[in-house]
Swiss-Prot record:
It catalyses: tRNA(Asp) + L-aspartate + ATP = L-aspartyl-tRNA(Asp) + AMP + diphosphate. NCBIfam families: aspS_bact (TIGR00459), PRK00476.1 (NF001750). The keyword Ligase applies. Residues 195-198 are annotated as: Aspartate. InterPro entries: Aa-tRNA-synt_II, aa-tRNA-synth_II, aa-tRNA-synth_II/BPL/LPL, Asp-tRNA-ligase_1, Asp-tRNA-ligase_1_N, Asp/Asn-tRNA-synth_IIb, AspRS_core, GAD-like_sf. Catalyzes the attachment of L-aspartate to tRNA(Asp) in a two-step reaction: L-aspartate is first activated by ATP to form Asp-AMP and then transferred to the acceptor end of tRNA(Asp). L-aspartate binds at residues 171, 217, 448, 489. This is Aspartate--tRNA ligase. It is found in: Cytoplasm.
């Protein structure tokens, strides 16, 4: 039906006859001529219909946006004054001699010349996908997956598929469940990750595994999450955490070089503890140079504990942010920031405007001026390295509240004052996470998942002080986004049982949910490690997209619905009866 694609015709094709298929992007009727911008997935080309060729001209009068058409014509060079340097085909045009209208189109519910609301875009996704921005994102995504497969194949990894219908296991988020018709009252689960299967593959002797795989989590959504998502899943035997990180680092560097022509520097590495202390987050955006500065030792006197209304029985922290040249901030803006940190349970936000350092207390304007003396002020200025014209924001509270509040305020101020550097890439590894979290009842749960090995395979700390155990795990962060996470896995059956015991999984539940893994670990399981990288997030970053939906062909809304197909939906009662399922009203 066609000999060329619209976006691929160039000046070298002048006087050549072409056959094109595509859609009407825009129509302009100038009386003697009708100009049509014709579009396919490669781009646009201008087609001319002349009045003197009346038969085809008359047909062209019926054209409307998004009609699907076929055009035969001759490539000709545009006059210099009519050339369009904004498009790749701007030097040429097609003089049409045949027009076939393959299909008409209703008036569009979307306007490609302006922004459309998200619900309309998702409801008419088949039209939204015709836009060049979304189409370009999908092309880039295709190139990224090609590069990944090529890289992994060259590193001798095998692409192996794992089951989609699997067993429900406690992995953190809720499972999507699939009822079994053949086994009444029993359910499959859609995998949150291929975690257990890829470990089984290592036990099977598959030395190097990878897979670009769909995963499913029934969790609350946000701009960088979807209920079904794609991850680059990697597992390898006999490889240290350091070498896994090096492998992934080289893969990420290759993607950034090939897609963005950017040479990423060596990825820095910091511990979880350091990240929380300096940035208030285990996903720090290093494009923002502001760091949290601890001043607890400066305010250790009892009068300060009283002033800040701190409970001495709690794990407290006093810390601040130093904002360079921020003393110009208005009282209203400071009040706005106070309200902002209160969203994260901070009781109050204190501030100090440094007008003139040399004047001591006389040279500052502060909400804590009445408890400061020259010695304390000097220590604060030295610790924060603040200068004239700076502003300090201080919070005194429980450590986790201070970290969260100042961490979020750091990000907000970075954006508000243009401190966070755009068009810059700052990857880093976060390592040495705690092995377990403790809830208010004192119960422990895995920070990552219960198959993560303790650092240095330290059995004694698991036995005597599990709450102090450090895991041999690692997360990859780029510009504040968690791109991936992984760990060295437990390959010793007794240690695996020990971890299950620590997090409160009863023996009967261990056998019911993980019996196949426990049994497999008894047969010479090798040391192994792995990682999972979020493909959707990687594509989102590489395309400069604001939302993960813009890099997925058919995404869900933040309420996990598909507006195009109206799913999830009700099903026929007969189907439910076959599955022995009864609908209960809430």
């Amino acid at each position: 039906m066609r000999t060329k694609y619209c976006g691929n015709i160039r000046i070298s094709h002048v006087n050549k006859k072409v056959k094109l298929c595509g859609w009407v992007h825009k129509v302009r009727n100038l009386g003697q001529f009708i100009f049509v911008d014709m579009r396919d997935y490669t781009g646009l080309v201008q087609v001319i219909f002349e009045l003197k060729n009346y038969k085809i001209f008359k047909k062209a009068l019926n054209l409307r946006n998004e009609f699907c058409i076929q055009v035969f014509g001759t490539v000709q060079k545009r006059e210099k004054k009519n050339q369009n340097i904004k498009i790749r085909t701007g030097e040429i045009e097609i003089l049409a001699n045949v027009l076939n209208i393959l299909n008409t189109s209703k008036s569009l519910p979307l306007n490609f010349t302006q922004e459309n609301n998200d619900d309309s875009r998702l409801k008419y996704r088949y039209l939204d996908l015709r836009s060049f921005d979304i189409l370009e994102n999908l092309k880039i995504r295709n190139k990224i997956t090609y590069l990944i497969r090529n890289f992994m194949t060259k590193k001798n990894f095998l692409d192996i598929e794992t089951p989609i219908l699997t067993k429900s296991t406690p992995e953190g988020a809720r499972d999507y469940l699939v009822p079994s018709r053949n086994h009444y009252g029993k359910f499959y689960a859609l995998p949150q990750s291929p975690q257990l299967f890829k470990q089984i593959l290592m036990i099977s002797g598959i030395d190097r595994y990878y897979q670009i795989v769909k995963c499913f989590r029934d969790e609350d959504l946000r701009s960088d999450r979807q209920p079904e998502f794609t991850q680059i899943d990697i597992e390898v035997s006999f490889m240290s955490a350091k070498k896994i990180r090096n492998l992934v680092e080289n893969l990420i560097k290759k993607l950034w070089l090939e897609i963005r022509n950017i040479n990423l520097k060596k990825f820095p590495q910091i511990s979880f503890h350091e990240a929380m202390k300096k940035y208030g987050s285990d996903k720090p955006d290093l494009r923002n140079p502001i760091e949290i500065i601890d001043v607890s030792n400066i305010f250790k006197d009892k009068k300060f504990i009283s002033f800040f209304n701190l409970n001495p029985q709690k794990n407290n922290r006093i810390a601040l942010l130093c904002i360079s040249k921020g003393a110009h901030l208005s009282r209203k803006k400071i009040d706005d920031y106070t309200k902002y940190v209160q969203r994260f349970d901070a009781k109050k936000l204190f501030y100090m405007k440094i007008k003139e350092c040399k004047l001591g207390c006389l040279g500052i304007h502060s909400s804590i001026k009445n408890i400061l003396d020259e010695i304390i002020l000097k220590e604060i200025i030295e610790k924060s390295q603040s200068k004239n014209g700076d502003i300090l924001f201080l919070i005194a509270d429980q450590e986790h509240i201070v970290n969260k509040s100042l961490g979020m305020l750091r990000l907000k101020i970075g954006i508000d004052l243009n401190i966070t550097k755009k068009n810059r890439w700052e990857p880093l590894w976060i390592v040495n996470f705690p092995m377990f979290d403790k809830d208010i009842q004192g119960n422990l749960s895995s920070v990552h998942h219960p198959f993560t090995a303790v650092k240095n395979m330290d059995r004694e700390i698991l036995k005597n002080s599990p709450d102090l155990a450090i895991s041999d795990s690692y997360d990859l962060i780029i510009n504040g986004y968690e791109i991936g996470g992984g760990s060295v896995r437990i390959h010793d059956v007794n240690m695996q049982k020990q971890v299950f015991d620590i997090i409160g999984i009863k023996k009967s539940m261990q056998n019911e949910k993980f019996g196949f893994l426990i049994e497999a670990l008894k047969y010479g399981a090798p040391p192994h490690a792995g990682i999972a990288l979020g493909l959707d997030r990687i594509v989102m970053l590489l395309t400069n997209s604001k939302n993960i939906r813009d890099v997925i062909a058919f995404p869900k809304t933040t309420s996990a619905t598909c507006l195009m197909t109206n799913s999830p939906s009700t099903v026929d009662n007969l189907l439910l009866q076959e599955l022995a399922i009864k609908h209960l009203k809430k």
